[in-house]
Amino acid sequence: MPLVAAMLTRSNGAWKKATSVVQASICRDQQRPNHTTITSVTSVSQRRHFSSAENGAKPSRSHPSAAEAKQKRESDREFLISVLESSATKRDAKAYLQTYGSSKAKAVPKESPASTALVSDKAIPEAKDVSFFVQGSVPVESLEADEVPRVAIVKLREPQTWDDTLLGGVAKTLTRLRDLGLRSVIVLECSAEKSSVLDWKDVVTQQTDRLQKAIQKYGTPGAELVDGGIWKRSTTPPSASSLGHTKLSVGFGEAFTAPLRHGHILVVPSRAVVEETLEHTAADANEVIFALAKYFAGLQVNAGQNQTRTAVVDRVIIIDPFGGIPARNLGDGARVFINLEEQFNSIKATLSAAEPQDNGSPIPGISGNPKASHIENLELVKNILAILPSTASAVITSPIEAANLQSNQAYDIRRDAEEAMAGEVKTRRWQNPIIHNLLTDRPIYSASLPIGRIKSTTNGTYQRSSRMPTTTLAKKGLPVTIFPDTRTRSWQPPKPGTPRLKLTDTCVDLPRLIHLINDSFGRKLDAEHYLNRVQDSLAGIIIAGEYEGGAILTWERPFGLDEETAYNSGRLVPYLDKFAVLKKSQGAGGVADIVFNAMVRDCFPNGVCWRSRKDNPVNKWYFERSRGVRKLPGSNWAMFWTTPEAAVKDQVMEDYEDVCRGVVPSWADSKAAD
């Protein structure tokens, strides 16, 4: 595991130094929460937000109790385990270190083209001062003047309904994110029933104070309350984005950027200052979040303000008691991954058509309607990700998952209510979905992984989980183009003699398709031979984005059958001929999952087969997504299929095997076929 290797390959001196940091951190005093208001924002830019370790002050001589020290050690151990269990690959580790590591970690030596997918032997050891792999209360370094912080904008929905254990767990996770290089700007949405404005103000004040104190327990610098940084105008200002039709804007940017540069976690209540009267008023939390995203991205157009990026928004995190966006079938739990470019409209339509909750919230103590909340969250992440770089992503999860609480009797009622909404599935050993996503840029479960393949990693056998994941990862994503179009129906065997799709048709960019195949497989396709081979059997093609990934599928005939006989007898075999992803897109953005899902859900929902070399390292990925696999005796092929078990008969398997044995490869070299 690369993150483990990153620890073990350090020198002994560096290891001792990192360990001493952890030990010293136990003895640090807890600082009181800071508070920035509209009356003091003019001094924010002049204040220095240093911890005692940063400004040279000596740590306090007071020591924690034995119980506190034990709790601290257990907390550090839990987080270290969560990092080690993140299932990060070498590619993940390299990408993470280049984005969030120290300046030395980012200066990874250039590699030869042949090794671009792997971390070189020298890359990890050079990151000697990436001390976040040994987690204690890690000293957070202030950024240089020309650096901008990497941040997550976090929405906490209904925190007043969370008990202290739940809030503390979420606070710990957000503090760990900061230790790993991602600083949070937290917006509170307290939408409880209120009888007066005064009552609502009291709730907001109470919850911001609770959250600050919860964060403060996990080291310094702590949380900074920014109350007065969001302004509201009586008229909507001009916007750099058509999505930004809001009266809210960031009125004093230094109230946010100064404490962020010094490592603070920001707490922002959902209220704004009316410019004309300088009075506080309630504000929609989603509009506050969008205003912050626009400001950080340099898209806020206000007179007298520079249109420059003040922070890099890498994540939008929504922690909602209702959890992630539900799957089409409630029994399948939350959607693991959403490609917004392709799926937003259909998912919103599905949610809108769902039956409303007649009896209010299904979770005790939580107000609101799940259906409305899910649609609101879906629209929020779409609007924000539309103005952020394509590398940004959104995580929608529940407080229990964000806190990574293990099985606890105190949460049995709430957990049962969540499972009643999401359904019960087989799941693996629990991981923190937010930490996992930061380290890998992926959800815990692959988007193309069948529900039946989600299993425990502790023993190889299927297990029932005491609770199930309710987390959704959303990205701006890629458009998916499918020929022939599947919006009306899936692909069907063509009647002999009828026109069919050709790879030379004008709708297909053949040079880019060939480049995709050559780049993905690392070898040259014999294009002429391949075109001749598939011209009479092509079923269709799937293209992700600008030919970043794709699949070519065919209708193959078992040996000895002519086209007419195979069609009339229903024995044409749906076959995955080529599955390709550009090397630069492999392991990132879910391109492979997007293509695979389009194949099995839209094109061939009744099953498809393919072959792969027995020693192909991709076979594990294929195995997890298939419904069956068989090694073909006397050959170097393994055969996979996604056909439902009820449809797998002896004749079907014989035809599948015959096709997988008989397809002639079309490579220009003499190497063994892939």
UniProtKB/Swiss-Prot annotation:
The entry's keywords: Acyltransferase, Amino-acid biosynthesis, Mitochondrion, Transferase, Transit peptide
Chemical reaction(s) catalysed: L-glutamate + acetyl-CoA = N-acetyl-L-glutamate + CoA + H(+)
Pathway annotation: Amino-acid biosynthesis; L-arginine biosynthesis; N(2)-acetyl-L-ornithine from L-glutamate: step 1/4
GO cellular component labels: mitochondrial matrix
Chief location: mitochondrion
EC number: 2.3.1.1
Transit peptide extent on chain: 1-50
Protein name: Amino-acid acetyltransferase, mitochondrial
Organism of derivation: Podospora anserina (strain S / ATCC MYA-4624 / DSM 980 / FGSC 10383)
